[in-house]
Amino acid sequence: EQAKKDTTTTLKSTDGKVIYVKDDNGSFREAKYADYYTKKEFYLKTSKTTGQYRYTGWQTIDGRTYFFDKNGNKVTGEQVIQGAKYNFNSDGSLNSGSGHMGIDVSKWNGNIDWNAVKNSGVSYVIIRCGYRGSTTGALIEDPKFRSNIQGAQKAGLKVGVYFFTQAVNEVEAVEEASMVISLVKGYNISYPVFLDVEASNGRGDRIDAATRTAVCRAFCQTIQNSGYKAGIYANKTWLNSYLDAPGLSSYKIWLAQYVAAPTYGGRYEMWQYSSRGAIAGIKGNVDLNVSYMGY
């Protein structure tokens, strides 16, 4: 907490070089510890005489996505960035057949500058549209859903949605799916509709694996019957122990595992590899994902 307020101590790279940030007026200044929590783009000075700076990280230029290494150079070939594998063409542009970088957001991410998100190299976003209360069982729309999906699509990002379930039977699962279908009507959803299945110390934790799997199937089948792609979000432990993952073979799997490389032995089409990402346009941490679905 103290570091978030430290506006006097200068940020430096691991080799002792001063790190800079660009202010809203376009001028560069030395970065302070507090900037780490508010700024998303950092620079190193390349020339003391000309005052040139180099950019490190993701950048979208003329509709193509690149990644600049610590020396300010475009990377090429196969690269592992923040634990996720990507493949870049010889000119540095991200290969269309490579995994695609994306994020997922909810009301907890606050107000988002979607144009800045798009320009940072993000290609898609999975937006929480709603959830069921873990104790009351009430169905609730995420208060940021409409502004998030409208802003993301206006910025040119592909979108999908997710719903946090606390359904305890198939009837409630269909009820949740019906709510989602109503919420996304009129929006161009190109990524799947995911059911978020995870621990919450609530009503959904008390059902067995067979019932939970039946809940997932009922939700996903209702979604697919309405013309959308459907999937399940869960971590490795839940996929292995609290769900019958092979019984969900008709639906996409979105794996959550915060490691350098996934150790889950089953099939998955999308991987959430960090909950502490830093993306321009979003204050604080954000979940990072890589999709292998090819769209």
Enumerate the language-model features and the residues they cover.
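Short beta-strand/turn micro-motifs composed of small residues
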Residues: 163, 234, 257
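Glycine-rich, charge-decorated loop segments at or immediately adjacent to ligand/cofactor-binding or catalytic sites
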Residues: 172, 238-246
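Hydrophobic anchor at the start of a short beta-strand
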Residues: 159, 229-231, 253
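Substrate-binding cleft of extracellular glycoside hydrolase catalytic domains
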Residues: 99-120, 126-220, 224-226
